[in-house]
Amino acid sequence: MDKNDYLHFERNPSLFPKSTLDKVQKTKKYIEHYYKVAVDHAVERNQRRINLEQRLATERGSEERKNRQLRASGEKESQFLRFRRTRLSLEDFSTIKVIGKGAFGEVRLVQKLDTGKIYAMKSLLKTEMFKRDQLAHVKAERDLLVESDSPWVVSLYYAFQDSLYLYLIMEFLPGGDLMTMLINYDTFSEDVTRFYMAECVLAIADVHRMGYIHRDIKPDNILIDRDGHIKLSDFGLSTGFYKQDQSASYMKPRTGNTVKRGQMVDAIWLTMSSKDKMATWKKNRRVMAYSTVGTPDYIAPEIFLQQGYGQDCDWWSLGAIMFECLIGWPPFCSENSHETYRKIINWRETLTFPNDIHLSIEARDLMDRLMTDSEHRLGRGGAIEIMQHPFFTGIDWDHIRETAAPFIPNLKSITDTHYFPVDELEQVPEQPVTQQPASVDPQTLEQTNLAFLGYTYKKFNYLTMKGAL
């Protein structure tokens, strides 16, 4: 046969239909993910073996004992491999009570059916996360919780998904959150404030150590454990991590009646007594926590101004929370988010301290140095700058988690939820909605599922504990 009789085929992807190209990209992503996960797990497994061998090499003991530990480690790895192949689903958990609600998700107290263990289950609606371009934030939250070994960050045990939701199965902290405490107690003494702010400093410093910026530090996200100590949560909820389009909407100039309403609100707010301000803030606080916009009261001005920001933006938030603990309301609170934003941007004129509330020189100085320009903000050079401030004199930074907390939850059972606003969440369904809305087309659903590829996670150290599986 003459070589000219051969049919030469030149691959030209531009001639393929879009549906074919989409399938190719989808298949490519799935294959890449499969091998990446396999390699990552092999590397982690090998590193655990190396760490164990190095530890055993430094310990005294017989070779027989060391060999037993190595064999036990191998059995645990095999157990973990088997468990990794099982698929978790919503059916593996039963809801005890709804304990929290966000704009696009919920937090439930749940029990794992096969072990009886109690967890907090956070669910996020995938279509909303996808539509609102929250993919990076959702991934950042999951990745931080996976990487964290900090006692100051809520522990993540499992992450999984179905066609509707993303699920994070985390430790349940029965003491509620700092927002609930502030609503119940109005204000804290300086000693109590000192304790909580010191623990917040260490918690934020740990987040920064892992290479993250929280950007949404607020009382709602500071949880209280059974011993009264704090842990940070919510590293990517839609009500936090303000995006550029949200910031831009705040910056639109107000016209017509809107300006007059804002001016009237400010006039009324300025004539309120401290007691009235506190009551007004408490009345509106829960509503703002549940809204799609959230509350900007604790956000640093540089985040709104899109000037670029660093880890020190979290220290501004700490100053705003400290103000609320001592005064009874945040420093820039208003009747609406636009007014709050305006006040934060113009903080030099709007940051004032009420004359009828006594503050020590040290407390006032610390707040002034936290809520200031980023260039001069305390903590810009690291958490040590804040830890050395005179307000924290007497704090045992190395052992603060071992000291008695000023408030220890009085719990009647491991499922006690009376520190959560469960009465306000009665309208939330007992079980998450499991049917896909008719308005969601199959192509969007397929894109959404592909976007969250790799979200699943199971914690090795926890799963291999005795009785954890």
Swiss-Prot record:
EC number in record: 2.7.11.1
Gene3D superfamilies reported in the protein's UniProt record: Phosphorylase Kinase, domain 1, Transferase(Phosphotransferase) domain 1
Biological processes annotated in GO: cellular response to salt stress; cortical actin cytoskeleton organization; establishment or maintenance of actin cytoskeleton polarity; intracellular signal transduction; maintenance of protein location in cell cortex of cell tip; positive regulation of establishment or maintenance of bipolar cell polarity regulating cell shape; positive regulation of exocytosis; RAM/MOR signaling
Sorted UniProt keywords: ATP-binding, Kinase, Nucleotide-binding, Phosphoprotein, Serine/threonine-protein kinase, Transferase
InterPro entries to which the protein is assigned, alphabetical: AGC-kinase_C (IPR000961), Kinase-like_dom_sf (IPR011009), Prot_kinase_dom (IPR000719), Protein_kinase_ATP_BS (IPR017441), Rho-assoc_Ser/Thr_Kinase (IPR050839), Ser/Thr_kinase_AS (IPR008271)
Catalytic activity as recorded in UniProt: L-seryl-[protein] + ATP = O-phospho-L-seryl-[protein] + ADP + H(+); L-threonyl-[protein] + ATP = O-phospho-L-threonyl-[protein] + ADP + H(+)
A Gene Ontology molecular function term of the record: ATP binding
Any Pfam family hit: Pkinase
Domain Protein kinase, residue spans: 93-392
Top EC class of this enzyme: transferase
Active site per UniProt: D216
Gene Ontology CC terms: cell cortex of cell tip; cell division site; cytosol; growing cell tip; nucleus
Domain AGC-kinase C-terminal: 393-467
Function: Interacts with pak1/shk1 and coordinates cell morphogenesis with the cell cycle. It is essential for maintenance of cell polarity and is involved in mitotic control.
Family: Belongs to the protein kinase superfamily. Ser/Thr protein kinase family.
Subunit organization: Interacts with mob2.
Protein name: Serine/threonine-protein kinase orb6
Record organism: Schizosaccharomyces pombe (strain 972 / ATCC 24843)
Lineage of source species: Eukaryota, Fungi, Dikarya, Ascomycota, Taphrinomycotina
